Amino acid sequence: MKLLKEGIYQLDRNQISHINESDFKNLVESSSKVDRLRSRVLYHTSPNSEPQHMLMCFDSKSIVEVSFHTFGESFLILSGVAQYRFYSTKDGSVINDVRMSPASMKGIFYTYISPNVAHRFFALTKHVVANEVGYSAFSPEKTFYGEGNLYDASNKVKSEELAIQPLIRNTD
């Protein structure tokens, strides 16, 4: 595994059979040391690869703003507990929550996020490790952030606040 920059690693695609325990430990430890408090191992070979596949680790204080992409993405929780919150693009209101945990905990362990759906990820335990697949290359032209009056309050919510709130379920 090659260090590209602090918190971002690249696997050698010619040698993938497993991730060593020490590599996994490095991923978790580095998530608490980088500015945005998340680290990743890139499985894809270049920034333009499609799809883009990453093993990610989020610290509970990780900074993840409301965002939406022009492509779909999948998220599979391997360890820890997390929550996705989905927002209306019309008025910024919360439309649905999905609390996630590993399959071994018999929780919801997989979420697919459709294109152009406003969402935010929250790590609810000290560390959350997950596989993420973006069905396109991540780029500024394909990713938008919820800013302004619609999402200001949503971007200020902290994981520890969200963890004690009831889940919101859309019944439509």
What are these regions, as identified by a protein language model?
Residues 88-119:
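Short acidic-glycine-tyrosine-enriched beta hairpin
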Residues 54-70, 104, 115:
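Conserved short histidine dyad/triad with adjacent acidic residue
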Residues 53-57, 74, 110-112, 132:
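Conserved hydrophobic/aromatic beta-strand scaffold that supports enzyme active sites
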Residues 60, 70-90:
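Glycine- and acidic-residue-biased ligand/ion/polar-headgroup-sensing regions
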Residues 64-67, 84-86, 111-113, 119-124, ...:
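Short beta-strand His + acidic residue motifs that chelate non-heme Fe in jelly-roll/DSBH
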Residues 91-98, 120-172:
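Double-stranded beta-helix
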Residues 42-46, 56, 64-69, 76, ...:
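Short histidine-centered beta-strand/loop micro-motifs
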Residues 1-50, 96-103, 157-172:
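A short, N-terminal "cap"/entry segment at the start of jelly-roll beta-barrel domains
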